[in-house]
Amino acid sequence: AVGTILPAIAERLGINPAAIVASGGGDNMMGAIGTGNIAPGVITMSLGSSGTVYAFAEQPNVSPQASVATFCSSSGGWLPLICTMNLTNATGVIRELFDLDLDAFNALVEQASIGADGVSMLPFLNGERVPALPHATGSLQGLTMTNLTRANLCRAVVEGTTFGLRYGLDLLRQTGLQSQSIRLIGGGSKSPLWRQMVADIMHTEVVCTEQSEAAALGAAIQAAWCQSGEPLASLCDKCVSIDPASCTLPVAANVSAYQQAYQRYQQHVATL
C-alpha cells in the first residue's frame, strides 16, 4: 500500500479517512481474486450484461485467436479472457418484448425443450466479439409454423448467449487451460435453470461462490493483501467460500442434446 488517503480528499469524497491507497485492477481481475482464481486449474465465468470467461495462467499463452485477450492478472500472473457482448442484455430484450418478469421468463425457458424445437438465435444485438463479428446483427433461424412460440424464443436467446460462452471456453481450452469446475458469478448465476444449462453446455461442473459480488470481494482482498503483506492465497482461503448448494453437475442426456444444438449454432455462425 502507498499509504492512507489524504484527509482533505477523504472529507471531499465522504469516505473513511483511514482508507488505504493501494494497487487496483479491472473488474475481471478483481473477479478472479474474488473467486480464488489465482492459480492454474480454476475457470471463472460471469453471467452479466456481457459474459466473460477467464483463468489464471503462469505464462502469457498468447492465442492465435484475436478473441482471446491475454491480460495481466492482478495477482502476479496472466489472465487469458474472452468477453461476449450479448448476455443478460439480450435475454432482457426478449423479456421486455413479451412483458415478462424474471419468474415468468424462466418458466417459459423451462417449458421449451433443449434446442428450442429447432429455433436458433444468434443474439448479436450489439455486434459480437466472441465470435469476432463486430458488424453482425441478431438473427433467428429454423422458424416454422409450429415452433414459433414464446417458450422457444425465450429458450433460444438463453441458449444462444450461452453457446457464445461455450465458443469462447473452447478457445481458452485450446491454449491448454483446463478446470475440473467452473466458478459462476454475475446476475445470471442466481438462476438454477441457467446454472444447469451452463453445466450441460460446457460439460463441466458448475459452482457459485457464497459472495455473488466477486469483484467487490476481490478488491477488498487485494487491499488487505497490500496492507497486511499476508500471502494472497491465504487471504483467498479465508475469504472465498464455495456455496455447496449451488453445485450443479452436467446431465449426460442433456450434454448430448445441447451438443447437437451447439453444432447447429456453429453452422449458422460459419455462414456470417
Walk through the language-model features, giving the residues of each.
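Active-site core segments that coordinate phosphate-bearing ligands/cofactors
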Residues: 3-185, 190-272
